[in-house]
Amino acid sequence: MAVLSVLLPITFLLSSVTGTPVTSPRQQSCNTVDEGYQCFSGVSHLWGQYSPYFSVDDESSLSEDVPDHCQVTFAQVLSRHGARYPTKSKSEKYAKLIKAVQHNATSFSGKYAFLKSYNYSLGADDLTPFGENQLVDSGIKFYQRYEELAKNVVPFIRASGSDRVIASGEKFIEGFQKAKLGDSKSKRGQPAPIVNVVITETEGFNNTLDHSLCTAFENSTTGDDAEDKFTAVFTPSIVERLEKDLPGTTLSSKEVVYLMDMCSFDTIALTRDGSRLSPFCALFTQEEWAQYDYLQSVSKYYGYGGGNPLGPAQGIGFANELIARLTKSPVKDHTTTNTTLDSNPATFPLNATLYADFSHDNTMTSVFFALGLYNTTEPLSQTSVQSTEETNGYSSARTVPFGARAYVEMMQCTDEKEPLVRVLVNDRVIPLQGCDADEYGRCKRDDFVEGLSFVTSGGNWGECFA
């Protein structure tokens, strides 16, 4: 586990970012099962996909509660893995950058003092202990939300084949089972859930939880180009300030972003509960964090979402699997589904009522856009920051943070013959598109499926190999 060689007082760190003192999270409950990570929210909710999960239920006028006259009959969670160390390639770049700063800077004063003796010791790729705890909490929350179903059944669980994703599924199970065993009304004698299916991430293998098949998409630079464009907009003034404050250093725009990345990665590695904020965070202003957060949204939107012509197509396979589960009918798909797995009841049952799938932020972004959840989001500006109000709720921090979870629930109500479907992303009800959503954001199941014509037709998947 990574160890930070210098820890600054929490109140100093946040006051450097926001200008106001902050109560130590050790004195308050700021990381909970229900609300997720609310510690240092003035900055931690601005880390894009590197933010730990936080509930955004209050960002919708629609209640996330199940109406009293309705009963949930089906629930599916699609989850991102928990907080992790940087990827191996990024970890090497971060270490190299910090070493260069330490070698070249002739002065380390004020908020930069910690850099002089900072020891880079972050791991790579795997979950941090904090990330493991996130998924335990996620399992507890899933059980509690769908208790009437969960107390009597065992969920069917799949994971994409990277170690951190599999481990996330296992930690989710730990939390789910902990909640179930603590429920006096739960059915006794049932086996504990297991990760029933692990889908390999070997290149060329069909996997609805991890993209890799679409040649044209994998070769696309649309996301990188958009990211570079906005990076060039907001980083020059930061480069100028940092080079002045750290005399002797020469930094690129990309390296500024790397230093900002360290704020999140260092924080989630310091403690199991996220109660210490990394001193890297104080190196940047509140406005700069808003710009950084928007950069991550631009990157995801143009890399894997609606801003990439083939982005939503990468989510078609999972969306067709979801339709099969909702309708209890065989999967109909010719994109990323694995026919061998999906035609076998042992590896793709259609009679379950609880499902959990574990994936990555990129593929989840594609799934959300394949389902049309953010069809009302206009193309993101690549030159100026847009608020989440302007993007109709879309941002990478609010959709695919570490430990993100989307719930697809089907309910039977006394005033409706047909079951109703709705989707919540990190607790925010997303009014369904392509069908006549009611005041709860729900659509009749058949109308929901009919509205997914992009998915059921295979969309523009054929362009992958043109």
From Swiss-Prot:
It holds the Pfam family His_Phos_2. Disulfide bonds join C30-C39, C70-C413, C214-C464, C263-C281, C435-C443. The keyword Signal applies. Keywords: Disulfide bond, Glycoprotein, Hydrolase, Secreted, Signal. It comes from the Eukaryota. GO terms for molecular function: 3-phytase activity; acid phosphatase activity. It catalyses: 1D-myo-inositol hexakisphosphate + H2O = 1D-myo-inositol 1,2,4,5,6-pentakisphosphate + phosphate; 1D-myo-inositol 1,2,4,5,6-pentakisphosphate + H2O = 1D-myo-inositol 1,2,5,6-tetrakisphosphate + phosphate; 1D-myo-inositol 1,2,5,6-tetrakisphosphate + H2O = 1D-myo-inositol 1,2,6-trisphosphate + phosphate; 1D-myo-inositol 1,2,6-trisphosphate + H2O = 1D-myo-inositol 1,2-bisphosphate + phosphate. Glycans are attached at N104, N119, N206, N219, N338, N351, N375. 1D-myo-inositol hexakisphosphate binds at Q49, Y50, R80, H81, R84, T87, R164, K300, H360, D361. Its EC number is 3.1.3.-, 3.1.3.8. It is found in: Secreted. Phytic acid is the major storage form of phosphorus in plant seeds and, thus, in seed-based animal feed. Phytases are therefore of considerable economic interest. InterPro entries: Acid_Pase_AS, His_Pase_clade-2, His_PPase_superfam, Histidine_acid_Pase_euk. Monomer. This is Phytase A. The gene is phyA.
